[in-house]
């Protein structure tokens, strides 16, 4: 006990805070202390298997140590501690603080000890008629029994009330920084044992097909706790290390390690790992550690050769787990958290609700499980910033529809993480151990050999889309197997598209189950009131002259009507014009009114469209120059107001970002010598990008104030574009909400790039070339450029990965374009190369950039797909029907099948047609009443065009085709009517001449007539030539 050092500062801070909360609670009617004016916390003898409950938790919270056979009596102004002499020595140092403490020493004399107990009971009675105790107190031993006997005898009129919830709320639930630091360390230690250590051991066993018992594997993990060298060298999944000040001696087990597989699962993890062998199926591992008395727990499910049903169930579990973690906030109740989880199950797979656990977690800290903070369907406890929770989601007793053996008939799934509640998204202490299906699924069985997919037919770009189907590349039927395979692929694609179209129709009817009447689509415009002046004294001074006054400051035109100045806000005026008639000039001011039906103003809202409106006012004056000036002022004011409103509208979706939290204690990760797009104002020079705690920052070297901050919470997609086939290497960030970059440039895309090529010089004829024959120098230059490009790719990809790791709590992942699936097209004005990624279709090399998120696409339509055209267009319609459809035009027709394959594999329903459609009109119809649109068939009107054009390939090869019987009859009749067989011409005129051959003239006669006609024609030409000469002479 000589090494015991109690931190008196922390003791005083915590007990003062606790006493203040207690006093405030007593003032409320339904306080958590239940009106207790004194509190008793008992500790019995040391237990063989130590368990942490609220009685020893209060010891650790206040003193940092557990003092067995010790009684604590709290009153509102003093703490009394009854303990042995040895322990009392360590408590003496706490005296003299702000909160008084009195230490009572008990010895071996039973009578003296009883007097001390009686003294404490007197203090209880002095405090009040209620004493707070811990209801489920597990303390045991003679010391406890003696106290209970004295308390029962001397405090008969004092009632005992439970203070468990009060201790949890005011002492244990909300952690300070030192407590959170201990929990983070415990969590990292859990992650280190789970992955890489347990994961590697399990993988090796399964890979080698060894027979290892659960208990044996658990013991192996257990022994690592005492392996000091392991804790010094272990590397976490993020390649990071454990804290340098980690003391392995202060680590202790609170759970497991528990390993389960082979159909026997207990998600309470109440018992030890059994002696069954590790089974290659669903494997669950759970473990919990305590560090400096603070607990953390982790559990993961690993799927070995799972079937589709198991994968589907696990993906549902990860969806539930990640969703509730993301949505937990300060102020939510425990039952709301559980309700969110059940709501997801009911919407996705209602049949799984009966297998779901009865709670989704509990409070954790000094206690492994706080029974007053269980996240179930009944608990009304409010979560607060600083609380730490175990989030434990799982399904149990699930029947396997396709068991691979007798041990796979039933399985369970569970995920457990330790988190900290904040006012925004929680901090997940155990996040470094992955939970995704991709990371936790293992496939050891060899997949069945599949036949290689037939190569696509290379198409001639000079031939139209439809015409290519009429050209065969083979002569013999035996060579046409590829054609048949392509037809099968096309058939499967058509069937899949029909399924997708039906699914879209169902989803549309479900999303818009009631008439929307513009509530989803075109935004219903509201009548806006404009107030020029609030009081009379705000009118311009010039109104005294009863003349037309243009008040630019208040965007108002004041007109004299019936001897009184009447203000008209500029938004009520349509336009103003000046005209001359004789010696008079006329100023005509037109106002906005319903029913004008001009341009985009037809839907201009009015408070009462049936009221009487003044459409125009005309003023007459002999001062034409003044009226000309007034008309110009009104026009300029109108233009400025419209421009201002447009700028305001453009900036509506620009949100003010939180401040970037800079890294102060170390140098941030930096990528230097990069350019930014959109470019900053001023000279174009390369800057640097830094990764900080909650985002990244670009800094210009010219001015430190010229910087761009991008927060991880605002990152929607992160792309790395290698410099292969390009002149630059790129890190591209697509944002959720636009930000302002440079000189008031609004953008949703921020890009950092570096040029991949240096300036090349032609060294032909220089001295070096004199003595070097061949292309050695060109070869060296090419090699050097290849090395430089590879180094740039490695540098930028590595930095992109660092950004993703820093923003992993926001779900940021690096995505790369797949060049093999790319195609040329014109999304704006220039022809660019568009490439798909995992989640998007992008073009980030040339501005303006193009980023289309596949999940946001409702349907795609291919336009101008018809015979003879060398290219086609593609239109994306988004699920948010208020967004304008996105066009990618002039795609070469040889990419048609490739584009269709990409859309089909991305589960995007597509249609095709021969013409360009009027999409603004179509979307206006959709948004006018979306429910009615889907009730009338939805997008099926596009599908109808596709079906008419698409037909069966056999129909396109010939416009006329006979069946075999008709063909036989036709052959027989043609043989009977002609002696020339199948080689005879089908032309009727030729047949008539041949049939009458015996009645015609012979060859000599025909030749003679021909010569005569030649002579006659020659004479006619001579006569014509002579006549021309005569005419010239005249």
From Swiss-Prot:
Component of the FACT complex, a general chromatin factor that acts to reorganize nucleosomes. The FACT complex is involved in multiple processes that require DNA as a template such as mRNA elongation, DNA replication and DNA repair. During transcription elongation the FACT complex acts as a histone chaperone that both destabilizes and restores nucleosomal structure. Signal peptide: none annotated. PANTHER family: CDC68 RELATED, FACT COMPLEX SUBUNIT SPT16. It comes from the Eukaryota. The keyword Metal-binding does not apply. Residues 452-462 have a biased composition (Basic and acidic residues). Its main location: nucleus. This is FACT complex subunit SPT16. GO terms for biological process: DNA repair; DNA replication; transcription elongation by RNA polymerase II. It is found in: Nucleus; Chromosome. Residues 945-978, 985-1005 have a biased composition (Acidic residues). GO terms for molecular function: nucleosome binding. It holds the Pfam family SPT16_C. Residues 444-464, 502-521, 942-1034 are annotated as: Disordered. GO terms for cellular component: FACT complex. Residues 480-507, 625-659 form a coiled coil.
């Amino acid at each position: 006990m000589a090494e015991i050092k109690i931190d008196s500062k922390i003791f005083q801070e915590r007990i003062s805070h606790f006493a203040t909360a207690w006093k405030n609670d007593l003032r409320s009617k339904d306080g958590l202390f239940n009106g207790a004016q004194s509190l008793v916390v008992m500790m019995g003898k040391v237990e063989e298997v130590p368990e942490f409950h609220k009685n020893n938790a209060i010891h650790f919270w206040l003193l940092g140590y557990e003092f067995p056979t010790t009684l604590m009596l709290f009153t509102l102004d003093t703490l009394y501690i009854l303990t042995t002499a040895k322990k009392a020595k360590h408590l003496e140092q706490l005296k003299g603080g702000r909160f008084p403490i009195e230490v009572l020493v008990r010895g071996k004399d039973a009578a003296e000890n009883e007097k001390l107990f009686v003294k404490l009971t007197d203090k209880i009675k002095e405090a009040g008629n209620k004493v707070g105790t811990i209801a489920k107190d597990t303390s045991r031993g003679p010391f406890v029994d003696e106290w209970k006997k004295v308390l029962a005898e001397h405090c008969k009129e004092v009632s005992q009330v439970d203070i468990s919830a009060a201790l949890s709320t005011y002492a244990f639930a909300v952690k300070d920084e030192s407590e959170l630091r201990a929990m983070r360390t415990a969590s990292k230690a859990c992650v280190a044992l789970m992955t890489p250590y347990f994961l590697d051991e399990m993988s090796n066993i399964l890979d080698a097909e060894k027979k290892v018992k659960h208990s044996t594997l658990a013991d192996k993990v257990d022994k690592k706790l005492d392996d000091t060298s392991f804790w010094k060298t272990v590397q976490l999944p993020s390649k990071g290390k454990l804290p340098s000040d980690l003391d392995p001696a202060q680590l202790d087990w609170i759970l497991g390690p528990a390993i389960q597989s082979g159909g026997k699962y207990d998600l309470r993890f109440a018992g030890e790992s059994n002696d069954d062998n590790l089974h290659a199926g669903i494997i669950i591992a759970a473990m919990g550690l305590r560090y400096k008395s603070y607990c953390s727990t982790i559990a993961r499910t690993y799927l070995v050769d799972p079937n589709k049903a198991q994968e589907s169930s696990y993906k549902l579990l990860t969806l539930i787990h990640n969703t509730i973690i993301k949505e937990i906030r300060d102020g939510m109740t425990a039952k709301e958290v559980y309700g969110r989880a059940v709501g997801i199950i009911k919407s996705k797979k209602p049949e799984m609700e009966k297998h779901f656990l009865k709670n989704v977690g509990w409070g954790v800290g000094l206690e492994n499980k706080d029974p007053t903070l269980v996240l179930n369907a009944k608990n009304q406890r409010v979560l607060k910033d600083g609380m730490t929770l175990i989030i434990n989601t799982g399904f149990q007793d699930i029947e396997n529809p396709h068991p691979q053996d007798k041990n796979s008939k039933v399985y369970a799934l569970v995920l457990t993480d330790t988190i900290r509640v904040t006012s925004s998204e929680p901090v997940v202490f155990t996040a470094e151990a992955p939970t995704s299906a991709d990371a936790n699924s293992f496939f050891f069985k060899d997949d069945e050999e599949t036949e290689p997919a037939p190569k696509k037919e290379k198409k001639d770009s000079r031939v139209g889309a439809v015409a290519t189907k009429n050209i065969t590349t083979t002569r013999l039927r035996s060579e046409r197997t590829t054609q048949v395979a392509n037809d099968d692929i096309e058939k499967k694609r058509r069937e899949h598209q029909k399924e997708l179209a039906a699914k879209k129709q169902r989803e549309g009817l479900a999303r818009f189950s009631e008439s929307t009447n513009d509530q989803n689509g075109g935004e219903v415009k509201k009548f806006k009131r404009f107030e020029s002046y609030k009081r009379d004294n705000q009118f311009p001074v010039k109104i005294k002259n009863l003349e037309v006054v243009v008040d630019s400051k208040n965007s108002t035109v004041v007109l004299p009507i019936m001897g009184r100045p009447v203000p008209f806000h500029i938004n009520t005026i349509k336009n103003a014009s000046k005209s001359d008639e004789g010696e008079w000039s006329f100023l005509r001011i037109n106002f906005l009114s319903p029913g004008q039906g001009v341009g985009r103003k037809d839907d201009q809202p009015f408070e009462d469209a049936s009221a009487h409106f003044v459409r125009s006012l005309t003023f007459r004056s002999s001062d034409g120059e003044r009226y000309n000036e007034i008309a110009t002022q009104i026009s300029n004011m109108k233009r400025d107001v419209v421009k201002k409103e447009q700028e305001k509208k453009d900036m509506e979706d620009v949100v003010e970002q939180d401040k970037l939290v800079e890294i102060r204690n170390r140098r941030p990760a930096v990528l230097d010598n990069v350019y930014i797009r959109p470019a900053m104002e001023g000279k174009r020079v390369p800057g640097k990008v830094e990764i900080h705690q909650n985002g990244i920052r670009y800094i210009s070297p010219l001015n430190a104030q010229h910087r761009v901050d991008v927060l991880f919470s605002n990152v929607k997609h992160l792309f790395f574009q290698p410099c292969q086939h390009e002149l630059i290497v790129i890190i591209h960030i697509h944002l959720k909400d636009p930000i302002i970059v440079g000189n008031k440039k609004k953008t949703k895309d921020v890009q950092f790039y570096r040029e991949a090529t240096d300036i090349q010089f032609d060294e032909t004829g220089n001295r070096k070339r004199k003595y070097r024959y061949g292309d050695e120098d060109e070869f060296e230059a090419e090699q050097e450029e290849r090395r430089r490009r590879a180094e740039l790719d490695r540098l930028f990809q590595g930095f992109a990965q660092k950004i993703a790791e820093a923003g992993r709590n926001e779900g940021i992942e690096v995505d790369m374009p797949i060049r093999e699936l790319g195609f040329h097209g014109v999304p704006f004005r220039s022809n660019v190369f568009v490439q798909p990624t995992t989640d998007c279709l992008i073009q980030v090399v040339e501005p303006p950039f193009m980023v289309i998120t596949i999940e946001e696409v409702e349907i795609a339509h291919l336009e101008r797909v018809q015979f003879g055209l060398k290219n086609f267009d593609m239109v994306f319609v988004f699920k948010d029907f208020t967004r304008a459809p996105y066009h990618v035009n002039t795609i070469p027709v040889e990419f048609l099948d490739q584009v269709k394959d990409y859309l089909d594999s991305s589960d995007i329903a597509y249609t095709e047609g021969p013409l360009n459609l009027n999409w603004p009109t179509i979307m206006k119809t959709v948004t006018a009443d979306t429910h009615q649109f889907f009730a009338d068939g939805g997008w099926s009107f596009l599908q109808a065009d596709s079906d008419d054009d698409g037909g069966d390939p056999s129909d396109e090869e010939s416009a006329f085709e006979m069946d075999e019987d008709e063909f036989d009859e036709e052959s027989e009749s043609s043989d009977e009517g002609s002696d020339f067989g199948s080689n005879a011409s089908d032309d009727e005129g030729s047949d008539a001449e041949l049939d009458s051959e015996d009645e015609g003239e012979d060859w000599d006669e025909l030749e003679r007539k021909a010569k005569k006609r030649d002579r006659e024609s020659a004479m006619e030409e001579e006569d014509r030539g002579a006549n021309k000469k005569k005419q010239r002479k005249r």
